């Protein structure tokens, strides 16, 4: 292991920063890209603000789909389903 310059900050030590930038890919290689990627992607730990998800309102065309279906009366047959015998 190479000696580390004590006058240099730890985040500037050689090998402390990955050569490539972090991305949004969740493959195994990208999950182990750096410590931050491992925490965020591999373990699912996010520090910071949580984005507030807005509920999607139903479009008017979907709200009216219940009124388009006519209600059919239920046929209540008792006895022989072939019809009344005389």
From Swiss-Prot:
Binding-site residues for Zn(2+) 2, renumbered to this chain: 25, 27, 30
Region Disordered, residue ranges: 48-86
Record-level GO cellular component terms: extracellular region; host cell cytoplasm; host cell nucleolus
Q: Entry's InterPro entries? A: IV_Tat (IPR001831), Tat_dom_sf (IPR036963)
Query: Where in the cell?
Result: Host nucleus, Host nucleolus; Host cytoplasm; Secreted
Where is the stretch described as Core? 38-48
Superkingdom in the source lineage = Viruses
Q: Which GO terms describe its biological process?
A: DNA-templated transcription; positive regulation of transcription elongation by RNA polymerase II; positive regulation of viral transcription; symbiont-mediated perturbation of host chromatin organization; symbiont-mediated suppression of host innate immune response; symbiont-mediated suppression of host translation initiation; symbiont-mediated suppression of host type I interferon-mediated signaling pathway
Share the record's PTM remark: Asymmetrical arginine methylation by host PRMT6 seems to diminish the transactivation capacity of Tat and affects the interaction with host CCNT1. Acetylation by EP300, CREBBP, GCN5L2/GCN5 and PCAF regulates the transactivation activity of Tat. EP300-mediated acetylation of Lys-50 promotes dissociation of Tat from the TAR RNA through the competitive binding to PCAF's bromodomain. In addition, the non-acetylated Tat's N-terminus can also interact with PCAF. PCAF-mediated acetylation of Lys-28 enhances Tat's binding to CCNT1. Lys-50 is deacetylated by SIRT1.
Q: Motif span (Nuclear localization signal, RNA-binding (TAR), and protein transduction)?
A: 49-57
Q: Name one GO molecular function term.
A: trans-activation response element binding
- According to the record, the residues making up region (Interaction with human CREBBP) are 1-24
Region of interest: Cysteine-rich: 22-37
In this chain, the stretch annotated as Transactivation covers 1-48
| Covalent cross-link Glycyl lysine isopeptide (Lys-Gly) (interchain with G-Cter in ubiquitin) as placed by the record, residue numbers | 71
What else the UniProt entry mentions is:
This truncated variant has a premature stop codon. It may have arose as a consequence of tissue culture passaging. HIV-1 lineages are divided in three main groups, M (for Major), O (for Outlier), and N (for New, or Non-M, Non-O). The vast majority of strains found worldwide belong to the group M. Group O seems to be endemic to and largely confined to Cameroon and neighboring countries in West Central Africa, where these viruses represent a small minority of HIV-1 strains. The group N is represented by a limited number of isolates from Cameroonian persons. The group M is further subdivided in 9 clades or subtypes (A to D, F to H, J and K).
Q: What does this protein do?
A: Transcriptional activator that increases RNA Pol II processivity, thereby increasing the level of full-length viral transcripts. Recognizes a hairpin structure at the 5'-LTR of the nascent viral mRNAs referred to as the transactivation responsive RNA element (TAR) and recruits the cyclin T1-CDK9 complex (P-TEFb complex) that will in turn hyperphosphorylate the RNA polymerase II to allow efficient elongation. The CDK9 component of P-TEFb and other Tat-activated kinases hyperphosphorylate the C-terminus of RNA Pol II that becomes stabilized and much more processive. Extracellular circulating Tat can be endocytosed by surrounding uninfected cells via the binding to several surface receptors such as CD26, CXCR4, heparan sulfate proteoglycans (HSPG) or LDLR. Neurons are rarely infected, but they internalize Tat via their LDLR. Through its interaction with nuclear HATs, Tat is potentially able to control the acetylation-dependent cellular gene expression. Modulates the expression of many cellular genes involved in cell survival, proliferation or in coding for cytokines or cytokine receptors. Tat plays a role in T-cell and neurons apoptosis.
Which protein, by its recorded name, is this?
A: Protein Tat
Source organism per UniProt: Human immunodeficiency virus type 1 group M subtype H (isolate VI991) (HIV-1)
Q: By which gene is this protein encoded?
A: tat
């Amino acid at each position: 292991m190479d000696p580390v310059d004590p006058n240099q900050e730890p985040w500037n030590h050689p090998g402390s920063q990955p050569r490539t930038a972090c991305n949004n890919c969740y493959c195994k290689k990208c999950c182990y890209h750096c410590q931050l990627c491992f925490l965020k992607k591999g373990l699912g730990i996010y520090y910071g603000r949580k984005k507030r998800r807005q509920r999607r309102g139903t479009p008017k065309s979907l709200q009216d789909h219940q009124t388009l279906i006519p209600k059919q009366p239920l046929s209540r047959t008792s006895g022989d389903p072939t019809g009344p015998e005389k």
